[in-house]
Design a protein with these regions (language model features):
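A short glycine-rich, Lys/Arg-flanked "PGG" loop and its adjoining helix->strand segment in the class I
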Residues: 120-132
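Short catalytic micro-motifs in class I SAM-dependent methyltransferases
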Residues: 111-115
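A conserved beta-strand element that flanks and buttresses the S-adenosyl-L-methionine
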Residues: 108
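Class I SAM-dependent methyltransferase SAM/SAH-binding core
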Residues: 45-47, 51-96
Length: 252
């Protein structure tokens, strides 16, 4: 995939374009709880925490969380939100996590794995900071298990360009299991609708999805025009839902 520099443009609208509502957060937290150890509190790592979409909810549900984010601007947005006593945001990357060895019980990577350039280094670092038996919750798309959001078909090369961003599931699994990890769980999660079709169109216009970094300007323009015409027929109907994959891996 073409690298995306979140410090240039995307940070400005990311929180709005990728917002999750309270009901969606609840569904994801329930899914995370189902694959995490039962004990509380748990020390958590939100790796690639961005603008802090999930970090406070993780702290509320499970215990103190450190959000690690390489983008200065995205981190500034997160720090500008309401303070949370169980949350801190720090600079860092998957290949260089600024935490002590064996300091966290779990890590969440929510649609951030595909941005990691050196995946082998990231696996080593995750294995270092997680305690024995610690778990990685990897909400990633996979080329061979790729969701089909209703709006994607309106973009030229939409599905092809979006799926190409991600590795196949077996390749991701092999990256971890070849280094001593094991698969703990694989499931799909269907989050509730985020609003109307018209609201989804408005968020897509902000261009905060990785897809828009892979399309040409003309492809994005054509796709948005097609989508606008389709939405105009029924703008107030709920945005359709779709299943999203969640892979849980365990270290040691």
């Amino acid at each position: 995939m073409k690298p995306i520099d979140y410090d240039k443009v995307q940070y400005k609208d990311y929180a709005r374009g990728r917002a999750v509502n309270a009901e969606q957060l609840r569904v994801w937290v329930d899914a995370f709880a189902a694959v995490l150890p039962e004990g509380r509190p748990l020390d958590g790592l939100d790796l690639g925490s961005g603008t802090g979409r999930f970090t406070p909810a993780l702290a509320d549900a499970f215990g103190p969380v450190t959000g690690v984010e390489p983008s200065v601007r995205m981190r500034e947005v997160a720090l500008g939100g309401p303070p949370h006593p169980g949350v801190r945001y720090v600079a860092g990357a998957a290949e260089a996590i600024p935490l002590a060895s064996g300091s966290v019980d779990y890590a969440l990577m929510f649609l951030s794995w595909h941005h990691v350039p050196d995946k082998a280094a990231a696996v080593r670092e995750l294995g270092r900071v997680l305690r024995p038996g610690g778990r990685l919750l990897l909400r990633g798309n996979f080329r061979d298990h790729h969701p089909r959001p209703w709006w994607l078909e309106h973009f030229p090369r939409g599905y092809e360009a979006d799926a190409a961003i991600f590795q196949p599931l077996h390749e991701v699994v092999e990256t971890f299991t070849s280094r001593g990890w094991r698969v703990h769980d694989f499931r799909t999660v269907t989050e509730p609708s985020g609003g109307t079709r018209a609201a989804m169109l408005g968020r897509l216009r902000l261009g905060t999805l990785s897809l828009f970094g892979q399309l040409s300007a003309s492809e994005a323009e054509v796709g948005l025009a097609r989508l606008e015409a389709a939405v105009a027929a029924d703008p107030d109907s709920p945005s359709p839902t779709f299943a999203e994959p969640l892979l849980t891996l365990q270290v040691g």
